[in-house]
Every structure is written in C-alpha cells, then in structure tokens.
Amino acid sequence: MGITRQAYYQAEKRAQMTAQATEQILELVMEYRCLMPSIGTRKLYWLIKGKLLQRGLKCGRDQLFKILKEHNLLICPKRRYTKTTDSKHWMKKHPNLLKDYSAVQANEVFVSDITYVESAEGVHYLSLVTDAYTRQIKGYKLSNDMHAENVVQALHMAMQHVTDRATRMIHHSDRGSQYCSELYQSALRHYGVCPSMTDGGLAKQCFSYQNALAERINGILKQEFLITRCQTMKELDHLIAESIMIYNCYRPHLSLNMNTPNQTYEQTKTELIA
C-alpha cells in the first residue's frame, strides 16, 4: 500500500524535528559529560531536565536512556578492589563510635580512607577526608607511599576548611597503621576530634561495610573522574584537585535528595551558625 504525499512529508517533518531535539539533548549531555565523564543516566537527567524545559524539549528519563544507548553513551559501572589497609600492627585501635549513629549536620563526622591511583610514572596513593553529612571532600593528599605524614596532610587540609563545627566532632577510619599512628592521633587531639575506627575480631570481615562511605567516595572519584591516564604524578595531582572541585560543586547525590555536596553544606550552614 502506498502513502499520500502529505503523509510522507508529515513523517519526514516529524523525523527531522526528532533529530533536532535529539541533537539538542546530546548537546546538554556533553556539557556535563565534559565535566563528569562517567556520570550515570539518572543523575544526568536530573542535571539537564531544567534546561530541557527551558528549551521546550520533552524527554523523560527512559527516553534519555534510549538516546544514550543509541549513541553508545551509556556508562558501564566498574568494580575493582585493592586492599590498602594494614591492620596487623601493635598500635592502639580505637572503638567504633558510629554504631547506631548518624551525622545530623556538617562538620560532625569526617571519614577517611586511602586508595591507589596510577600515572605513567607508577602507582601513587590518594588520602581523602570526607564530610559524612554533606559528602564534601574536605581534604586530600597524593603521595608515592602510605606513610602517616601524608595522611596527616589530608587531615590538616580538611580542618583548615572547618569554620563552624559540631560540639562533638568524630573522625572515622579503618584500623590502618597510618590512622593508628601517634602522628595521626596527636593531630586529632590537636583539633579536638574524637577517633573512631572499624571493628576488629569477628567483625573484621565487615571492615569495608563499616567504612563504606569513605570507600564509596574513593570509587566515585576514580570511576567517574580520574579516567584519563596522566603522564606524571604532578599532572595527576592537578587532575585530582580539579576533579574534587567539580565533584563538590556539580555532582548530585541520591542520598542528598539530588543536591550536590556544596549545596547541602550551604543549606546547613545557617543552622550551624545559629
């Protein structure tokens, strides 16, 4: 059966309009993918939906998923774990203060962890300190080893950014030798921060779960931002600094009602000062 000339031109026009709309949608997608190369579809949709409305474009999350799939732009999650914790040492381990405890404001609980990153020069170690309530990365240090002095520098950076704090401030980490060291513990005492650590004994299989937030932030940074292979450690350090800025400013979190870490902090800052 044939179709009328009018029906043909109408179909042609619809296809053309769809192609133009798709082009605009992909343009918005690439704006954010340039900042956050591996951000997933759900968060991407949240970021662009306001701009879609401004342009009069109708596109739901399922439609965005379809468009990304057609253009080979879906992100496949990566899972890789490398142990960086050495808990078999003689130094004092502190109890877990976060059992049945959740932060209710910014600068109340900081979580710390060490992860490995690579450049063409070899393997390096990245120490991070994150605010458990806002998900802000507050401090970091890139180094060639896991010595305590490097981890302490990440803590110093984090505490420099604390202008208003909870009455009781907790620092939570695994039981690694760096965090148990006298150097690190004396730094916590200097800042008046209570140490908290993952459990040992029968609970040792649950280390990862007990410091899950810190390890989750490691994963986000490595899997969504640090995907370009840098030639030197210095170049990698610049990339990390830039990535942390973008993460804090632009990356929404489901756990924060799709707000960014910085937005969450700004929302709570008035309460902290009051």
Predicted regions and their residues:
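K/E-rich alpha-helical interaction surfaces of small helical-bundle regulatory domains
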Residues: 1-15, 37, 239-257
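C-terminal domain-tail junction helix/linker
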Residues: 189-191, 219-274
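Basic, flexible linker segments flanking DNA-binding modules
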Residues: 5-105, 202-208, 261-270
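Generic alpha-helical secondary structure signal
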Residues: 3-7, 24, 150, 154, ...
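An active-site-proximal beta-strand-loop segment
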Residues: 99, 103-138, 144
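RNase H-like two-metal-ion nuclease catalytic core shared by retroviral integrases
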Residues: 85-87, 173-175, 181-185, 197-222, ...
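Mobile genetic element proteins and their domesticated derivatives, centered on retroelements
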Residues: 1, 8, 29, 44, ...
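Active-site beta-loop-alpha junctions of metal-dependent nucleic acid enzymes
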Residues: 122, 141-164, 180
